[in-house]
Regions:
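Histidine-centered active-site loop/cap adjacent to the catalytic His
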Residues: 149-170
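Conserved C-terminal guanine-recognition region of P-loop GTPase G domains, centered on the G4
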Residues: 69-88
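P-loop/Walker-type NTP enzyme "switch/lid" segment
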Residues: 1-43, 138-139, 144
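Structural beta-sheet core signal
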Residues: 35, 57, 93-95
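Inter-motif core of Ras-like GTPase G domains
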Residues: 42-63
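C-terminal boundary of histidine-terminating zinc-finger modules
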Residues: 136-155
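Beta-strand-loop-alpha "switch" segments that mediate conformational coupling across diverse proteins
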Residues: 99-102, 111-142
Length: 171
């Protein structure tokens, strides 16, 4: 891993979804664990959702992406309802890759449409915008806030992280 080679902290542990996810989560005890699973692996996604306290859905600002989110929620709806009956799980959505021009309507329209979708409990007002810093930092194996701590991308990420993890990111 690039982070390890460059001795950048924190050293992030990455586990394969081929392993049993539930066992991996139990081994981490009370710490925060982020599981990133693509919709192409529906079995792993359902397993991750069943173990999750929160499901975070990033949605690009377009009608097609709102429809895709609606379709996804419909596909996993029964599984999510069963999980919610057993706990306090939340499904949270936010607009990702929003246009940097605040007058572009699609971002606002997407946020409004997400609020109407059944299955989404919270729509965050915090957004990540389409910024070159995100793309460039990813190719370096770093987060935008690590490469350019004072950048707009870093500030947007900090704001989103604080909304999601106020006890960790907000301190």
């Amino acid at each position: 891993m690039l982070r390890r080679e460059l001795e950048i902290k924190p050293d992030l542990e990455i586990h394969s979804v081929r392993a049993v996810l539930k066992d991996q989560l139990v081994s981490h005890g009370d710490c925060e664990v982020l599981v990133d699973v693509g919709a192409a692996n529906m079995a792993a996604m359902k397993e991750a959702m069943a173990a999750a306290d929160r499901i975070l859905i990033p949605v690009p600002p377009s009608q097609a992406d709102v429809w895709a989110t609606q379709r996804f929620l419909h596909m996993v709806g029964q599984d999510m309802e069963a999980v919610k009956m057993n706990g306090n799980q939340q499904t949270i959505a936010f607009v990702n890759r929003a246009d940097t021009n605040k007058s572009i309507r699609e971002t606002h329209e997407t946020e409004a449409a997400l609020r109407m979708l059944p299955g989404i409990d919270v729509v965050l007002p915090q957004r990540l915008r389409m910024r070159t810093s995100f793309r460039r930092s990813l190719s370096e194996g770093l987060a935008a806030f690590e490469m350019w701590p004072r950048s707009k991308a870093a500030e947007e990420f900090r704001i989103l992280a604080t909304a999601l993890y106020p006890g960790i990111a907000g301190s």
